Amino acid sequence: MTPSKKLFKKVYVELSDICGLQCSFCPNPKNIRGVMPLELFEKVCKEVVSLTPIITLHVLGDPCKLKNLDHYLSTAKRFSLKVDLVTSGVYWHNFETLLHDAIYQISISLDAGLDNRNKINQHRYIQKILEFCRYKFEKNSEVFLNLRIQDSTLDKHQNLIKPFLESFEFVSLEGLKTQGRARLFKKSFLNIQKTFKWPNLNAQNPLNQKSKIPYCYGLIKQIAILSNGVVVPCCMDTQANISLGDLNHTPLKDILKSQKAMAIKTHFLKGEALELLCKNCSYPLIRYKK
């Protein structure tokens, strides 16, 4: 089966829910599930390799906080899985690991490192990001670099973002704002990301019952596997409110064929949300307005 014909575009795999940060835009409780054992990660890779070409190491937590991250990356490479590494950029033990053969993209949330609640030296943080950019440039790496900042925080941090951008040729803050993205150098970009709110079971339906708005990529283009092995429809379900099953006890193919999973997918394909968490999620509205 060729990658283009695989069931999912990507599968989110949470290596841990530990990030050590307290970002104002992330209300989710963390440090509950802990680290996914390497043996379970190997099982995950074995079960998803026929379903997707890409695993995105993200739900909660920061994979770069793991001292043995290279072991997980080597396991992914053994199964020929491409890795999208999502990180805050705060916990980088060495740059060499970030250009591991298994990694095809590094996605960095600048909002995490620049959030005042985290009490991080912002200038030193941006300098570290710039140092990695230089390292990647010197290595002529084929890894994609996707730096992201939310549209609601760009102006607040422009005193840091403007000189960062001006470190690269033909790049400016004005150009970033106009285009919504800036090409820094080969396969390296800074993108403005639309601000969203994490879904909440108690939140009001942000779509106002507009059921025909295309809902979600969940179970259509993606699923997420939490660090304890629980499978959920998408990366927004950080607390497993819509648990589909546990990989420790049930094969993934059976979980995806379950009555619950099939019902959710069927409704999504019709532009409808079946679960309360999905009804209260604003992400579909952001996609609709693009």
Task: Indicate where each model-derived feature is located.
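Radical SAM enzyme [4Fe-4S]-AdoMet core and its adjacent flexible, acidic
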Residues: 36, 79-82, 97, 101-257, ...
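Cysteine/selenocysteine-centered motifs that mediate thiol-based redox chemistry or coordinate metal-sulfur cofactors
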Residues: 257-290
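Processing junctions and N-termini across compartments
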Residues: 13, 17-20, 210, 272-275
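Non-catalytic N-terminal targeting/anchoring module and adjacent flexible stem/linker
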Residues: 1, 213-214, 230, 280-290
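Local cysteine-cluster metal-coordination motifs and their immediate loop/turn environment
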Residues: 18-28, 233-236, 275-286
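Secreted/processed peptides and extracellular or luminal domains of membrane proteins
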Residues: 25, 29-32, 167, 222, ...
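Residue-level marker of regulatory loop/turn positions in helix-turn-helix DNA-binding domains and
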Residues: 3-8, 208, 217, 270
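Conserved alpha-helical substructure of the radical SAM core
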Residues: 1-106, 116-124, 288
